[in-house]
Amino acid sequence: MHESPILSNGDQPNRWAGLNRRVAALLLALIGFYRTFISPLLGPRCRFTPTCSAYGLEAIQRHGPWRGGWLTLKRVLRCHPFTPCGCDPVPD
């Protein structure tokens, strides 16, 4: 049986951590861009509390870029006129 390259090489976890930080920074920057430049043009449209962009920021900060990004994508796809409004916090 062979060892996983992530576990056998001490540098691998640092590479993954660096990648995760870069992906998280990119996602947070995209949300910041949306909040600064696009959202003011569109006006308030989100059906949920917190707003989808606030949800995305919190989800990525709490759960990291991969799970937080997935939760954010699912939330944005639920934000349409056929979904009831309401409170939809980031899950633990």
Swiss-Prot record:
InterPro entries: Membr_insert_effic_factor_YidD
Alphabetic keyword roster: Cell inner membrane, Cell membrane, Membrane
UniProt cross-references to SMART domains, sorted A to Z: Haemolytic (SM01234)
Superkingdom field: Bacteria
Bilayer topology annotation: Peripheral membrane protein
Subcellular location: Cell inner membrane
GO CC terms of this entry: plasma membrane
Principal cellular location given in the protein's record: membrane
Signal peptide: none
Function: Could be involved in insertion of integral membrane proteins into the membrane.
UniProt record similarity statement: Belongs to the UPF0161 family.
Name the record gives this protein: Putative membrane protein insertion efficiency factor
